[in-house]
């Protein structure tokens, strides 16, 4: 499935290359600290020292967030529950609510987090390699995109951690949607912190 997801993502990026309109990414790096600040005093209720850990991550991402990469229309939410398969072949992608104009490599960063960890914490290089190979057969990454995959993946994991953290404290008890534990993203971020280049992701 990962190879199919990579190829579909590349096709989506190529198809949108001539789309003339733009939409701001309202959940990019500049939005993360304002999202977190009202939750600072409550974060430690989930884990001791959690607020300070998040603050340190945000400081790193704010200093190191890439600029100048190829941009276009991105989905930004390519999780398995938004992708459909029939007989092993990708048949559809839904939920373009967060689609926007931003770095194309962001979608790959999302997919690395959403598709390439087993048991919620163990990174699967084979899956990542298939994902990136499927993508690059149609749209090869340039050197800057490859080099920034670790920080992009780290940042997108933090984005989802923060939205989960917000929902954890603001979802009504009788809501139909189920809260997702923000702590589940911590091992993913720790993995990306340990990566210094794109080689561990299986980039060829």
Question: Model features per residue range: what roles?
Answer:
Residues 105-140, 154-172:
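Active-site activation/catalytic loop segments of kinase-like enzymes and analogous catalytic loops
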Residues 38-40, 160-204:
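ATP/Mg2+ or Mg2+-diphosphate-binding catalytic cores
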Residues 3-6, 40, 55, 75, ...:
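Generic structural concept
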Residues 1, 33-38, 49, 63, ...:
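Structured catalytic core of nucleotide-sugar glycosyltransferases
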Residues 59-106, 204:
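Active-site acidic catalytic loop and adjacent metal/ATP-binding pocket
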Residues 141-153:
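All-alpha amphipathic helical-bundle segments outside canonical DNA-binding/catalytic cores
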Residues 1-49, 69-71, 176-182:
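A cross-family kinase active-site recognition segment
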Residues 4, 8, 53, 107, ...:
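Charged catalytic carboxylate motif
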